[in-house]
Amino acid sequence: MTTNNLAGLPERINRVSVNVANQETGLLTRSSHFSFLYTKEAPAVSLTMPNQPGPYNSGALHPVFTQNLPEGYLRRYISEKLRRHADVDDMYLLALMGAKGIGHLSYDAGLQLPESEPVAIEDILHWSGKDKLFPQLLERYYLNGMASGVQPKVVVSGSTLLQKDVIVKAFDDEFPLLTVNEFVCMKCAEYCGLNTPKVWLSDDLQHYVVERFDADESGTKVGIEDFATLMGRPGDQKYSGTYENVLKVVRLNTNSLEQVEETFKLVAFNCLIGNGDAHLKNFSLQYHADHTEIQLSPVYDVTHTIIYPTIDNEMALKMRKSKAFPSRRELVDFAYSTGISRSTAGKVVDNLAEGIAACLARLDEANAMEGLKSSIEGHLHNVMEKSHIQPVYRHDKKKKYY
């Protein structure tokens, strides 16, 4: 966005019209508190906020509206770019997000922002320019939709009708080659049969690219709510909770044992892969605007955190009153406490362990980050060894990556 465009922005925003799947839904305002008031018979903005005659008042902005706001790097970048022209707070970020945020909620405060030129995925993956690519993408796309999280990332528009929008992530000095780390973990998840979006890793290892999954096959956006929102918690409480409650929320909202089992599979995968950052915002449910077909969203934001010395060697949430990574037996006991049979849970854990080991054995990128492969393998061995069970890793030579 040019300086002239920035000069036309209002200094402050206190009223934002909220839409669900392009249908006017209500008005969000700020005075001494935040207030959201539905229009008559409008679709609900959240599974936790049914349409009601009176307003939803809150001292802080409602979780469903804050869940996709940028954190850390991107938020600081936006604030710095606009600081001479606007007071960038949560309401302002919603207005800037417009219709390009994750999920089917969109926001209108009358801002007119220019469209950014699209970029082909191939140009990102095979970048060979002298200057670093990510700063250029950030400059072009920092207002092109937003995604939560502290990792440097930007939403990039697809260059063709067949190419969906993607999220491009980089890394900083604290977490070197986090791009490789996440790519490897996501490929392991795919190998294990979890529902994953398409992902890519650039030739120079500087960029991890993931396809957006917040639209159905017809291109209609779906609702997406992370578990902090579903539990009525602000994002800064994303590490407060238990995996037991994660599964309870799934059961309550889907009334489906299959979805509960799928969520257990994802929780168990995070434990086996050594992801200590599987917090409430890294799980979500998705659904249509009429709140039908509620199901677990595809896997996202999975990394092997144990390899980084600045991150505690423990889980993000508690399981059975502890944040220590569980053993196989403890995972099975956890599943049983949530209504899943021990035999089903045991098979899930064993199959995941086999899948992770087999994927690491054949995925070339697992060797692109020094120590990553051995660290994951060591953690996996420790989890399974605690129960004196050695998984038999079957290697399917027919299964390959493309």
Language model feature labels by segment:
Residues 1-280, 284-402:
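Phosphate/dinucleotide-binding and metal-coordinating scaffold of catalytic cores
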